[in-house]
Amino acid sequence: MSRLTSAHADRRRISSTLIAIGSARRCLPLFVSARPGTPLRVLCVMAFDALHQLRCSKPLPVATHRVLAALLDFGACTNAIFDGKEYSRKELELTRQILDDAGLHSIVEAVLRQLSDLEGRRPSPFGDDRRFHDTRSYREAVVRLWLGTLAATVAGNGWPAEGTRAPYGDDVLEILFRIVMQCQIIDDVLDYSRDASAGLPSFLTASASLAEAIERTHQASREYAHHRDLPRSDDVLPLRMALAVASICARLVILVRRWRSGSLKSATSPRTRLRSTAASG
């Protein structure tokens, strides 16, 4: 009996791995196309293609790949607007038109309303432990909103989702959520100087002390990496492996940031300059 169980588990692991490889092969053209704009967004499309095949036993249509790519680029533009960063108005209008043509007008409108509400309550940087918690919750809410939107988009091809509801109850999407959060941590660590200068909320700008922010971010990364409450089924093996890789990368980036902050302490840090400017004002 144990041999049969082991053989069945091996088949499921092999099957899930082949599905992941197939999704990567189908999405390869996206790496050299104009859309989506970054390799990380291509990997996101790959993940949803693989998840769809796991659930529905068939890959996503190529047309849906293009819609997901447009949605990811549209999200990047809207986030840049809320952050006060440069963005392409032409790109924003073009991606919005693609989404409207795909029948996603109502979903996009709902997302923009929810996103406006979240951004209207975004926490300010450089606070206490409570501020870090609020910033983390804000970051998580934005990620869950966009993941829910992507899931709702895939729902038009057989995925049972409900509108733009965030994927709280879906164990498989929870793994993807944690992968994205690890990537968010990596991005926040790498963009610390720019975020601090601009006064943007992030994992590293949330706390008044950079050292405390690094430690709290490290703890958050460990929590996202924890697999105790994640599904252990063999069909999600590729996702669990991806989470492990993202977690290792996040930990390494945090360790490097900790080392740099310890060896390069000076009064010219973006955090210090921002405080000095506020005091002189």
Model region roles, listed by residue range:
Residues 88-89, 93, 204, 235-243:
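Short, charged, amphipathic alpha-helical segments
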Residues 34-49, 64-67, 84-196, 248-252:
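All-alpha helical catalytic cores of prenyl diphosphate-utilizing isoprenoid enzymes
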Residues 18, 95-103, 220-231:
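Hydrophobic, Leu/Ile/Phe/Ala-enriched alpha-helical segments that form helix-helix packing faces
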